[in-house]
A protein has these predicted regions:
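Short, surface-exposed coil-to-beta transition loops
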Residues: 3-5, 59-63, 83-88
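Short beta-strand segments that buttress and anchor functional surface loops
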Residues: 49-56, 74-80
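Beta-strand/loop substructures that line and gate deep hydrophobic ligand-binding cavities in soluble
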Residues: 77-129, 134-136, 145-147
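Generic structural detector for well-ordered beta-strands
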Residues: 7-11, 38, 52-54, 64, ...
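A short, structured loop/turn motif at beta-sheet edges
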Residues: 14-15, 42, 66-71, 90-100
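Hydrophobic ligand-binding cavity/cleft-lining segments
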Residues: 1-42, 147, 154-157
């Protein structure tokens, strides 16, 4: 399957956006692309952390964090027979006092071409839903409690 990527600018602090992204069990509260996310370990999200993700129209999948740079990015990977899925979540400074969030997903393996035929539209739709839901969630909270400093809105350089 060809990689799919989307990005969105969010008018909220980096801390707010990162907090929403790293709290994976709460994703179903702000994106309809997730039915449930269950952490399979305790503690802060870190390399090696695992979560069982249930999404509409898809079987449950266990994702493992393979890379994490706090307040900047995390990548997680799901390995199943014939297919490996990799999803990236990256934060960077956006225009004005916004945070740019880039979400991407790619699949490799013997079954990737078949999955592309069957589910590429669904994958794109879910990634877009995640981006839009994250924006709504973070900006609604930002309006309720604006940051005290415009610098707080910026992703680290």
């Amino acid at each position: 399957m060809a990689p799919y990527e989307t990005s969105i600018n969010i008018a909220a602090t980096t801390d707010k956006v990162w907090s929403a992204i790293e709290d994976v069990e709460r994703w179903p509260r702000w994106t309809a692309s997730m039915t449930s996310v269950e952490r399979l370990d305790r503690g802060p999200l870190a390399r090696g952390s695992r979560a069982r993700v249930k999404q509409p129209k898809l079987p449950p999948v266990v994702w493992t964090v393979t890379d994490l740079e706090p307040r900047r990015s995390f990548t997680w990977t799901a390995r199943n027979p014939g297919i490996t899925s990799v999803a990236d979540h990256q934060l960077s400074p956006g225009p004005g006092n916004t945070v740019n969030v880039r979400l991407s997903v790619r699949q490799t393996g013997l079954l990737a071409p078949l999955l592309s035929l069957l589910a590429s539209g669904l994958t794109r739709r879910y990634v877009n839903m995640e981006a839009e839901g994250l924006k709504r969630y973070c900006e609604a909270d930002a309006v309720a409690s604006p940051a005290s400093s415009s610098e707080a809105h910026r992703a680290p350089a």
